[in-house]
């Protein structure tokens, strides 16, 4: 949701040079990529030198998107994109894959078809085009998002199955759009009366003048390769780079000396470096130690930040770290708190002009979302899923749960059967903390038009996170909006404090800073205090790696349970936790997993049917078009030339597990069974058939009688064909002979 003021790491305040531009347009990316790739797309007709240059450029684009420069992703290996790892085929595949990625990134507003790729790549690589294109499409690397041109590519009929998605946040919305494009039936159940989840843009103001205020996730953290940047480009929404200048002020309102500020920042970063060295030495022992305790011991060991002003400055950096992790340093794992650092998105941190609701609104378009549906029970099994929300039951083939980790920790949803123990343990181990805000709309910008952030020190360490950082949203919100952040221990006490008291304290801080400068701080027109920890649909802000946890716990949360229950959300992504783009990417990931699960199930059914269709299958189908005796699921055929009651015939029992699923109203049933009608056979005498007909109680009782009293065993078509070939042949011959005689009699 929130991010620290940093460029490349959550460890440090940004030291980047100030940008000369206040705003920039992501649409310029189209021109940049086009310039590198050339004006024409006729790759086949390029010179060797041109092709080599383009291949290098496309490789760099792929690297910026997280692909290895000369290897396959683990997902690609699992998907079997090439027949043999290593060698020429893999190298050729990588070139084709990179070309497809670059082509789509060149214009993310247009659907990239497989046919378009075939126009620019030699025919000899057609099989690699299909392999790479299908992988990139189904795993959400191309053709994702909200471009209006994509709607025409959604199948008219949803034949892939049905999915219930719990939660209309970024994860749920991303998954829903992907699944619809794959041909699934989808509904979203959302407990709130709005979409977005922890991304919440509130409109405040008066007399028709309203502004956008971000009460939840606010900053796009690193624009390079960020899927939210792709959405912004598709919607032609400009982004505002968060400028680097972040002056700090003492508790009395006077500015912090810049030299002292730099000195303490160096101390802070060196302490973190020492933590890294120490945990390497300690090995597994660091697993049980908090980051806060190690930092404090090192501070005392090196005798740094001993006077009040230096300690307050160091506390400010600690508060910034607690903001980045939504947790107190005393809770963060010294061993793994920064395990996601290698995966951080590059580039500037940005605000979205007009607020993040613009992304949410676009993602919601065309999706069936049911608001006010707080889910309390999820039942899942071999036959599908049932989701209970209040007094309503919803049925589908699969369910995707995207609720926040805080909701899972509170056991607000009952799972039947219970989740696997390893997943429950991961839910318990991972941390889920707080970040709160005071959002204020003022009559005018008094803090300076050229300032996006400024910070304030606190006298007491336990209050270091209280109003420690201010964000000015006047550049993107449509008005003079200022937001004060509350992190760490202060965020917890904030939850039970009186809003008017909190506002007075914020104004006191602001007036302490600006009054000595001769600047009057007016009362806000309107203000809002968040309470994310008390919100029953989140119970917190975002996740972190707590003591005795590790990054692998994110992987455990992401694991599906069988092929019916799936999980997404920021707390299910090891690489991008606690970020908006992480939530979005997890939705794309789970859409791919659901699609793959269906493919596996369909392949299983196809192989099962093929296995049970023997050479006599056509004969069996012919015989049972007109059975001699039929009741319920039971059909019988006999040799009409043999009247003996002990003579043998064939019995077919047809199992159709989709019976009863029906096409009920959407609110009560949303299932489209994968299962096919399954005919099974056995031999049976005329006498036994009539015995079976007399059994009362319906088909279940007849089946029980057939097995237990008559001792009959059902077989597939192939088995019965091998076992009863002569019997089948005799009955067919009799039927055909009878038909020929009848034909001759009926002729004039």
Question: What feature does the model see in each segment?
Answer:
Residues 1-12, 17-19, 243, 247, ...:
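Plant-biased detector of terminal regions, especially N-terminal secretory signal peptides
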Residues 85-88, 96-106, 187-208, 328-332, ...:
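Short, composition-biased local secondary-structure segments
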Residues 1-100, 126-140, 144, 148-152:
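Long, charge-rich, low-complexity intrinsically disordered regions
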Residues 616-748:
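Feature captures hydrophobic
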Residues 43-70, 74-75, 112-118, 132-134, ...:
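FAD-dinucleotide binding site
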